[in-house]
């Protein structure tokens, strides 16, 4: 094969790869924007049974944590989230727990751990919302951080580790 032809084939392959990566990233970005809009508009209920939407906290950095009382890693990370809500001014950062569980179990669990941030109750449709936000497996815990404008800044499947949330929030609070 002539050197010119070989270089052209390599450049063509690189171009196709770059186009595919761009399309994949674009699809993920669109999926994240759609998922964020749906998350903000989704009608949850609070522990008193009143309808609540996350859009009420738009303008703040939001840490939306999907969890369940039966999920061991979820239970382990809750003290970290309680500490984070105490550390950060609620005027700037709002942590919201979205329980995929029965309200009575969430109420009981919340009183045991003295959870200080708002807890909302989700139905099974929350799994679809999580999938739109990139959690294809629907696993828990799943944390979505939204910037002040309501766009997805970060997602994390699995329990947050100490200090990890600080690293995620730091650039959003500048």
State the predicted function of each range.
Residues 75-114, 124-130:
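Structural microenvironment flanking redox-active thiols in thiol-disulfide oxidoreductases
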Residues 41-61:
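A short beta-strand-turn-helix
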Residues 69-76, 142:
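C-type cytochrome heme c attachment motif
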Residues 61-62, 141:
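Alpha/beta-hydrolase fold active-site loops
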């Amino acid at each position: 094969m002539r050197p010119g032809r070989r270089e052209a084939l390599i450049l063509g392959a690189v171009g196709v790869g770059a186009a595919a990566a761009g399309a994949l990233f674009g699809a993920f970005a669109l999926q994240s924007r759609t998922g964020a809009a749906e998350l903000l508009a989704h009608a949850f209920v609070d522990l008193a049974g009143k309808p609540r939407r996350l859009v009420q906290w738009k303008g703040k950095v939001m840490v939306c944590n999907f969890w369940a009382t039966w999920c061991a890693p979820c239970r382990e990370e809750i003290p970290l989230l309680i500490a984070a809500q105490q550390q950060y001014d609620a005027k700037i950062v709002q942590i919201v727990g979205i329980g995929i569980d029965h309200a009575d179990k969430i109420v009981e669990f919340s009183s045991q751990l003295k959870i200080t941030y708002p807890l909302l109750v989700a139905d099974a449709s929350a799994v679809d919302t999580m999938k739109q936000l990139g959690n294809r497996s629907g696993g828990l815990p799943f944390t979505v951080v939204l910037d002040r404008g309501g766009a997805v800044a970060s997602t994390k499947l699995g329990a947050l580790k100490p200090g990890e949330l600080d690293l995620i929030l730091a650039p959003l609070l500048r």
